[in-house]
């Protein structure tokens, strides 16, 4: 493989050092512990240690953190020669995003007295932002370099934070599990980014855009981690007590239903009755996405099952039929199929939230209406008005994602960012020391010459 020019080899370390130096300076100026983290403030109030929010929120934070770094990272290792990059760049991009999101979300949500005040909830919210960025990463997986990904993360985190603030704080939209703010935003930001970065000569690397037995097995590890911890992901920001409990129950049942529908549809559409690991690794997770908005609401266990089954069905059909259409007709190369796992289920989840919000009544929620729909409980909105705001929130998210992704694509076209050439996409050796291996251009896909597109 040709030696990389010196100026291109310096781009990544310079960007890493520049970004870290800038965020460290901003942390020194603005970031302080909140009242539950600061030693003096906590003990001044004579609180019991067991009342500290850490003990209520940390288990959820730990699960979400594992999802971001292990779940997303390993879900994307299906590419036969891109495992180092899938896990390694996930590690890099998420680490930058966590710092940057802490600042952005802090300025918007917890800035007072001239400082940003952080605690365990700040860590959870930063992880959510990182999740959206990694969803977008899936759309351009294998076609972008690490320097490009760092700039993508910087831009996307800004737009994510602004969109989240508009929806949750200004519009009063309910979206605890992020069907809109995380999944829909991340998916369509990534899709429009990929559309702008379209590669007409990607066929030169198509033989690498496939899996082998072991890479699929490792990707399945990511799926299992995500599947098991998804109830924590959706419930982490919800009100303690019945709201968090209900969110876990709804997500749990929705995931089981999406798994069953995925296995059923995968066997049906294969032609020979065999299962496709692409479907199982991804569409089985759609149940967690589709109830993100409504999981804290009175969706009912039956509603969760129905939503999950529909999401698994739509996602599986998307992988089989819709992804090839996106590339052939719309020139949209979605490496991981994020449109099928996060995009369409995210939009379905937003619509489900509209319906469930419209049905909210004092009789159904009792005093719990205050924690789920505070504006309805205070008489400031009717259930119908809340539903309209939920729908409007979805359209705002789509606008932010599409415009932001398009602008991000233009930014990532800057020549000094060291994008891999068309003939070297989906290849670890471009950016990593790969021990004991030499590139073998004669490797062919194992699935009848078809490339994988999944999330």
Curated annotation (Swiss-Prot):
- SUPFAM superfamilies tied to this protein: Ammonium transporter
Q: Does the keyword Cell membrane apply?
A: yes
Q: Which residues lie on this side of the membrane: Extracellular?
A: 32-58, 105-121, 168-175, 238-248, 301, 365-390
Give the location in the cell. Answer: Cell membrane; Basolateral cell membrane
Region (Disordered), start-end ranges: 434-455
What GO cellular component is one of the record's annotations? plasma membrane
Comp. bias regions, Basic and acidic residues: 441-455
Q: How is it modified after translation?
A: N-glycosylated.
What controls how active this protein is?
A: Inhibited by amiloride.
The effect annotated for residue 183 to A/L/D is:
Impairs targeting to plasma membrane resulting in loss of transporter activity
* InterPro entries, A to Z: Ammonium/urea_transptr, NH4_transpt_AmtB-like_dom, RhesusRHD
Question: Is the keyword Signal in the record?
Answer: no
Which residues of this chain are annotated as glycosylation sites? 46
Query: What is the reported tissue distribution?
Result: Expressed in kidney by connecting segments and collecting tubules. Also expressed in liver by perivenous hepatocytes. Expressed in the forestomach and the fundus of the stomach. Expressed in duodenum, jejunum, ileum and colon at the level of villous (at protein level). Specifically expressed in kidney where it is restricted to the epithelial linings of the convoluted tubules and the loop of Henle. Also detected in ovary. Expressed by hepatocytes and dermal hair follicles and papillae.
The record's similarity note reads:
Belongs to the ammonium transporter (TC 2.A.49) family. Rh subfamily.
What does this protein's UniProt record list under function?
Ammonium transporter involved in the maintenance of acid-base homeostasis. Transports ammonium and its related derivative methylammonium across the basolateral plasma membrane of epithelial cells likely contributing to renal transepithelial ammonia transport and ammonia metabolism. May transport either NH4(+) or NH3 ammonia species predominantly mediating an electrogenic NH4(+) transport. May act as a CO2 channel providing for renal acid secretion.
Any idea what this protein is called? Ammonium transporter Rh type B
Task: Please report the organism this UniProt entry assigns to the protein.
Answer: Mus musculus (Mouse)
